[in-house]
Every structure is written in structure tokens, then in C-alpha cells.
């Protein structure tokens, strides 16, 4: 391969056997091994967090694609919606989307969330999420459920996360779920 890259010129490979270059090569090998081990540890942590999330939310399997929705506004005006995507527990920034709110009244977070979800789920060419996460409480959860049902996607798992109280609102449950701040599932949702 290297010979072809060099216009078929002969290539000699040398591996240092002693001295400073040998020490540098050993240091390089050690650093690469440490980076691989660190990356494997991070992957295992994400997998564990996804498994815990599935267990806590009673999902049939760990969610591979989590879509999180948030509504923000500046003093009740200039309302916008945001979509963040996590694939296998990793942020996928190229799939993030920003929605300018067109129809909801300023300050009406429920209507703004409904508009964002309607616009997102009208796009059939986008991949389907394994879990829909909305920022807020019971009201946002109800708004999201209504839109998903109307869009024919009522089968999708949806939860709401009230960040200040660190509580998870689940469909059909009267009381929110409270997890310890160090719980891997909660930490995954809070990203």
C-alpha cells in the first residue's frame, strides 16, 4: 500500500531497537493503550446508563436514539424550540435542530412544544426515536403525548424531565420518579 503511494518506490521500515527513539515508541504504545482503555470504559459507562434507563422506564430494550425537546424564550417573546439527539448515549450534534415558533402565542410553552413536535413528526424521512424526552413536567408530558397520538406515533415512549427537581414524569403515573443525582440513568437524561 505504501509502496503504491510512493510511485512504486521501495519502502524500508525501521523499528528502533534501542535508544531515545525506542523509548519514544514505547511511550507512544503506552499512550495509545491508555486511550483505548479509557474509550472502552466510556462506552461501557454509556451502555450501563442506557440499560439502567431502560430498566427504570420499563422499556423493552435500551434506547438507541433519544430525542430531547426544549422550549426557550426571551422574556416571553422570541420563542424557539430545540431538538437534541443522542445515539447510543452519545450526543450527535449534527442531528440537532432549532425550530422558530411560528403559530404558538408568545409564552405558551405547551403550544410551542406541540408545534415543534408536530413539525418534527411530520417529517417521515427522519429516523424514529426510541425515546422522546421533553423538558418540563406533567403539562409538557401531556402535550407531547397528545401530539404523538395525533401523529400516529402514540406507541413511542415519552417522558418529561423536570430538571430543577430532578424528577421524571412517566405516562400513567401520578407521582414523578425521583432518582438519586448520581444515578446513571438520570445523569444520561440530564446531558
State where each predicted segment sits:
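Acidic, glycine-enriched active-site microenvironments
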Residues: 1-191
Amino acid at each position: 500500500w505504501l509502496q503504491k503511494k510512493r510511485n512504486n518506490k521501495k519502502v524500508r521500515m525501521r523499528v528502533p531497537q534501542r535508544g531515545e527513539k525506542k523509548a519514544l515508541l514505547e511511550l507512544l504504545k503506552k499512550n495509545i493503550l491508555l486511550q483505548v482503555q479509557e474509550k472502552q470504559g466510556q462506552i461501557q459507562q454509556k451502555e450501563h446508563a442506557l440499560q439502567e434507563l431502560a430498566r427504570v422506564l420499563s422499556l423493552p430494550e435500551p434506547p438507541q436514539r433519544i430525542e430531547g425537546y426544549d422550549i426557550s424564550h426571551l422574556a416571553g417573546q422570541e420563542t424557539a424550540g430545540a431538538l437534541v439527539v443522542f445515539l447510543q448515549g452519545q450526543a450527535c450534534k449534527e442531528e440537532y435542530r432549532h425550530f422558530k415558533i411560528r403559530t404558538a402565542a408568545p409564552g405558551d410553552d405547551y403550544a410551542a412544544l406541540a408545534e415543534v413536535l408536530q413539525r418534527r413528526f411530520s417529517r417521515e424521512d427522519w429516523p424514529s426515536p426510541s425515546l422522546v424526552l421533553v423538558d418540563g413536567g406533567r403539562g409538557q408530558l401531556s402535550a407531547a403525548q397528545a401530539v404523538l397520538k395525533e401523529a400516529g406515533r402514540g406507541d413511542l415512549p415519552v417522558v418529561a424531565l423536570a430538571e430543577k427537581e430532578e424528577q421524571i414524569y412517566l405516562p400513567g403515573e401520578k407521582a414523578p420518579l425521583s432518582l438519586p443525582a448520581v444515578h446513571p440513568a438520570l445523569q444520561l437524561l440530564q446531558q
